[in-house]
Each structure stands twice: as C-alpha cells, then as structure tokens.
From Swiss-Prot:
One of its GO terms (biological process) is glycerol metabolic process. The phosphoenolpyruvate-dependent sugar phosphotransferase system (PTS), including enzyme I, and histidine-containing protein (HPr) are required for the phosphorylation, which leads to the activation of the enzyme. Keywords: ATP-binding, Glycerol metabolism, Kinase, Nucleotide-binding, Phosphoprotein, Transferase. Its EC number is 2.7.1.30. This is Glycerol kinase 1. The keyword Isomerase does not apply. It comes from Lactiplantibacillus plantarum (strain ATCC BAA-793 / NCIMB 8826 / WCFS1) (Lactobacillus plantarum).
Length: 505
C-alpha cells in the first residue's frame, strides 16, 4: 500500500486543509489556506461558499505539488467539515443565492425564539435530539428563503438546493452529479429525525421548508460519487467518507465503544460521548446527535458544545494583545503565582452547553490591585477546563456512565499546563492523542474503510499509538473550592444583561 494514499479535506471555520495520509495513518502532506470571514452586522457571521470551494481546490493542488504524490495514487477522499453552516444554491448554475450562514451566526435567533415561544421546543428536541437554537441549519435555511427575493417559490419548484459544507463540496467535486449528506451532518440541521433516520415532515411543515431542496442522507463510509477529472487533475477518485468535524474526531480517536469520550479543543470545544446504538435524550441541555453510521449500524452520541475555547487564546493574542503566540499563554500560566482567585468567563457569543444562554457576555471576576498579566492569562486558560467540567458532569448525569479517561485533541491540547489543570479539575485522566489531527484522520479512516484501503475497525485499532497522559494531582478540597468559584462566576455572568446605547438608533 506504500504507493497508495487517502486524502482528507478538512474544511473548518477559518481555513481549509487537504491532508494526505499513508496506510499507517501518518500525515505525508498537509496544505492549508485561510479564507475571509464576513460580519455584515453585529452577531452575524458569513462565508462566501465559492471562496471556500476555491480554497479546497488550492489546497488539493498544493498537497500534490509539495509531496510529489500523484492524484492517481489517491484511493479515496474523505470530507470533514464545520457543521451546521448553511448554503442554498441554484441547481442549474451552481451559484449560491446568499452567503453561507455560519454556525456561530446569531442572525436567525428570532426564528428560533419564536419556535420556542410557540411551544415547539419539546417536539424539536424529541425528534432531533437538539435544543431549538439559531446554531443549527433549520433557522438559517428559513432566513435565506425569507430574505432572498423569490427564493421560497424557487425552492418549491425544485430550482434551489440546500447543503451543509459537506454536501456543497461533494456536489462541486462531482460536477453537480451528487446531492448527498451523511448521518452526522444531517443530525445537526434540526430537520432530521434521529429515530427514523429521515427528514422530519412535521418540522419541515412547521418551518415551510420544501423537502425538494434537501439532500439524500447516507452513511458515513461509502462511495458517494467520483471526482470529475477536471477537478482532480485528470483522475476520477472515489469520495468515500464524510462526517462533521466533531464526529470525525470521535472516529479518529477510535472511540468505537459506548462510554468513550473525547474533547476537541478548536475554535470552540466539543465534548462527545459514544452512547451506542440507541439515542440517549438529554434531560440537562446536552445535544443528542448521530456519531456515525457504518457497516449497517448507526451509533449515537451525546455532545456538549462550548462556543469559545481556542478563540479565547486568539482573543488574548489579537484582541487585547497579552500574548504574542499561543505557546506564550502556557509560559504565562506557569509564571502566575496567585491563588486562582481570578475567573474569566469567555461568553463572547453567549454560553453553550449546558447553559444555552445566548444573551450572556464575557466577564471577569476576582480582580485585585495585585492581579498580573500572567494571572489574567492563566484564568482564561482555566476557563477552557472549567467549561469542559460543566459538560462532563452533565454528561455523567445523562448517561449514568462514569468517565475514567477523557481523550483530547485539537490545537489547545498541545498546552501541557492546560492539560494538567484539566486532569486536576476533572479528577480524571487526560489522554492526549499521539496524532492531534484526529478530525482529518477520522475522515480518512471512513473513506479508506469503504474502498478497502483498511479492512475493518480491528485493523485501525491495531495501529493505535497512545499519546501523553496527564493524571490528577490536585487535592479534593482545592478542586471543589475552585469549581465552586467558577460556578459562582457563571451565575453572576448570567445575571448581567444590558443593551449598549448606540447613538442615532
């Protein structure tokens, strides 16, 4: 297999990557390209779908150029993507009728709020496993159909198509031949019935979204179509695996057994537990979602979404310029000598699970005249660990399963100080993946399995290499005191609600 490889297209919130893996799961090529973010109004976040497509083509080309690998050597392509982000495009021209509305965007919040006010929150939760929120695709589709002239009528005539990023890229790579999504991405739309495994007619009627614009839903590991030769340098290569980024990371962490939990520290942080072949509906504001469907079976998951994680470190660097780079934050935390009396609650876009408070805003507590730059940076890092504990504690309540080990990956997982504090505040062993590219690797595994590049899950397990572990060192009294302080800070943050004065409005 040395002359054959698997490519993963990892389309994230701020950049796109094309990564080529060999049979041992080693990364042999990696090309990355950022693309613009658009903020038309406060709280709105949009992308240009064609800029994403161009970034994908560019990274594919660069991966081949830099590695010397030929397109014909690629056995299969896996796609993993930022979830929920919504695109509606013209079926004939392939042109989007509006920018992609990003998962972070709050412009559709009034639609979600009206659904809750009208009493539909429980129905949506029971059918989809999700809370009713602007985070998911359903309200974004409705907003586009409402705000683009003639869009509703065109959608009803079958002239428009909807897709999350996976569907858009698959449609483009196959030259418009394949309009398909996978179980994991469908389960994040707030339109998919996770019990029946089909689009939910009641919710479609409720939101007046025409079923004709929705993609076919298929498993996470199968051949959906082949690249057009003009998009892949003369080669028609199977696109053979797809999964939303957090489910791909779960698969890349080889979390095949129920009760296995992983946390990916990216722009946000996403804690996901494999709950097996039956959906476990949360009583505590976690999301019930589909982990992956493979080999005729569907595996479900509980998920806690934290909106701000790595972006808090970016804020330290770019927003208030307390650090020059992400590694500086670890050095600063080690140099802090206070008694952890400072708490930063980074609710820059509200609070995610388990609070789901879209009106909360970031806050700081415990400042004194003696507080230093290092103390503030340390408190910001600690917020990532505290938020993770919020979700893990909730996950244990919902599932009834103890969590002896938390598998971690993502950029902030490189921070040894943070990982040790995470172990301490959870009183749980932290296992950092040897290969932190678990999202792309999960997509590659799904793609490779369906084309026979890897034979089965056992072969993947046999290749697993453990990473670095962090064991708890903090005493129970200190752990309890610190977490109680965090809980008090969150409660105080939720009390403060104020609309700023804007002159002229």
């Amino acid at each position: 297999m040395t002359d054959k490889y698997i490519m993963a297209i990892d389309e994230g919130t701020t950049s796109t990557r094309a990564i080529i893996f060999d049979h041992a799961g080693h990364k042999v090529a990696d090309s990355q390209r950022e693309f613009p973010q658009y903020f038309p109004q406060p709280g709105w976040v949009e992308h240009n779908a064609n800029e994403i497509w161009n970034a994908v083509l560019s990274t594919i080309a660069n991966a081949f150029i830099e590695s010397g690998i030929k397109p014909a050597q690629i056995s299969g392509i896996g796609i993993t993507n930022q979830r929920e982000t919504t695109i509606v495009w013209d079926k004939q021209t392939g042109l989007p009728i509006y920018n992609a509305i990003v998962w972070q965007s709050r412009q559709t919040a009034p639609i979600a709020e009206k659904l809750v006010k009208d009493g539909y929150g429980d129905l949506i939760h029971q059918h989809t496993g999700l809370v009713t929120d602007a985070y998911f695709s359903a309200t974004k589709i409705r907003w586009i159909l409402d705000h683009v002239k003639g869009a509703q009528e065109r959608a009803e005539k079958g002239e428009l198509l909807f897709g999350t990023i996976d569907t858009w890229l698959l449609w483009k790579l196959t030259g418009g031949a394949t309009h398909v999504t996978d179980y994991s991405n469908a389960s994040r739309t707030m339109l998919f019935n996770i019990h029946d495994l089909k689009w939910d007619d009641q919710i479609l009627q409720l939101l007046n979204i025409p079923a004709a614009m929705l993609p076919e839903v298929r498993t996470n590991s199968e051949v959906y179509g082949k690249t057009k030769d003009y998009h892949f340098f003369g080669s028609e290569v199977p696109i053979s695996g797809m999964a939303g980024d957090q489910q791909a990371a779960l698969f890349g962490q080889l979390a095949f057994e129920p009760g296995t939990v992983k946390n990916t520290y990216g722009t946000g942080a996403f804690i996901v537990m494999n709950t097996g072949e039956k959906p476990q509906l949360s009583d505590n504001n976690l999301l019930t979602t589909i982990g992956y469907g493979i080999n005729g079976k569907v595996y479900y998951a509980l998920e806690g979404s934290i909106f701000v994680a790595g972006s808090a470190i970016q804020w330290l660097r770019d927003g208030i310029r307390l650090v020059e780079s992400a590694p500086d934050s670890e050095r600063a935390a080690r140099e802090s000598h206070n008694e952890n009396e400072v708490y930063v609650v980074p609710a820059f876009t509200g609070l995610g699970a388990p609070y789901w408070d879209s009106e909360a805003r970031g806050s700081v507590f415990g400042l004194t005249r003696g507080t230093t730059r290092e103390d503030f940076i340390k408190a910001t890092l600690q917020a990532l660990a505290y938020q993770t504990r919020d979700v893990v504690e909730t996950m244990k309540k919902d599932s009834g399963i103890e969590i002896p080990v938390l598998k971690v990956d993502g950029g902030a997982a490189r921070n040894d100080w943070l990982m040790q504090f995470q172990a301490d505040i959870l009183d749980t062993q932290i296992m950092r993946a040897a290969n932190l590219e678990t999202t792309a690797l999960g997509a590659a595994f799904l793609a490779g399995l369906s084309v026979g590049y890897w034979q089965d899950l056992e072969e993947l397990k046999a290749s697993y290499k453990p990473g670095t572990s962090f064991d708890p060192e903090m005493g129970p009294a200190e752990r309890t005191n610190l977490y109680e302080g965090w809980q008090a800070a969150v409660k105080a943050t939720q009390v403060f609600k104020h609309t700023p004065y804007h002159a002229g409005k």
